[in-house]
Amino acid sequence: MGSIRGNIEEPISQSLTRQNSLYSLKLHEVQTHLGSSGKPLGSMNLDELLKTVLPPAEEGLVRQGSLTLPRDLSKKTVDEVWRDIQQDKNGNGTSTTTTHKQPTLGEITLEDLLLRAGVVTETVVPQENVVNIASNGQWVEYHHQPQQQQGFMTYPVCEMQDMVMMGGLSDTPQAPGRKRVAGEIVEKTVERRQKRMIKNRESAARSRARKQAYTHELEIKVSRLEEENEKLRRLKEVEKILPSEPPPDPKWKLRRTNSASL
């Protein structure tokens, strides 16, 4: 049955939504209203069944291809589809000898048959209380009570998070005080961020100024040292060029004399 559920188009679900009351009828009730002159439902294929039970307005959709079925499924009779459903149920491990009575083909509704066959992927919610059924060119009104369906609505995780952030799952609007407080928090956050950015820029500017002053001071010292080095080099060259003069004689000289007689 996995292949039967594969290639079903959305127009089928939309059509069943419009004619949901009709699909709530049991198959033996549909056969009764169709009359004895009609073809038995068990020998009809699904394509014939849909064309038979649908009103003329919906038959136009069938002819136009809006209500298309997979070819392998549309050619199967109702009995064959029901047999496949029972085999699939037994193959999945469902016991046939249970305390609950298993429904027969005539006891299930047309909607249940299409659901189990995989034609419809979601349950159709009844919208009307009166159904007009085409039978040998005549319309028979069938009244039934709407079936109330209860269940939990599922939400994606991202939508749940968005709804929680917006203040809950209810549609009640937030109080003006909450909006004002939230706006003030946002404004304070933006103001703090701007002040932090200004401080960072000022600190970076002061750091660049200190680096530039230190570099300028080093450049001045280097230039002074280079000038002194150049002066010393020139003085040394001048000393090499000038001739060397002998040292001057002393003013008083020592002389050797004889003071004793021999």
Curated annotation (Swiss-Prot):
Family, per the entry? Belongs to the bZIP family. ABI5 subfamily.
Q: Which domain of life is it from?
A: Eukaryota
| Region ranges (Leucine-zipper) | 218-232
User: What's a GO biological-process term for it?
Assistant: abscisic acid-activated signaling pathway
Ranges for the region named Disordered are 239-262
Location of the bZIP domain: 190-253
Instruction: Indicate what this protein is called per its UniProt record.
Output: ABSCISIC ACID-INSENSITIVE 5-like protein 3
Q: Where is the composition biased (Basic and acidic residues)?
A: 239-252
Instruction: Write the lineage as a comma-separated list.
Output: Eukaryota, Viridiplantae, Streptophyta, Embryophyta, Tracheophyta
Q: Where in the cell is it found?
A: Nucleus
Q: Which gene name does the record give?
A: DPBF4
Give the organism the record lists: Arabidopsis thaliana
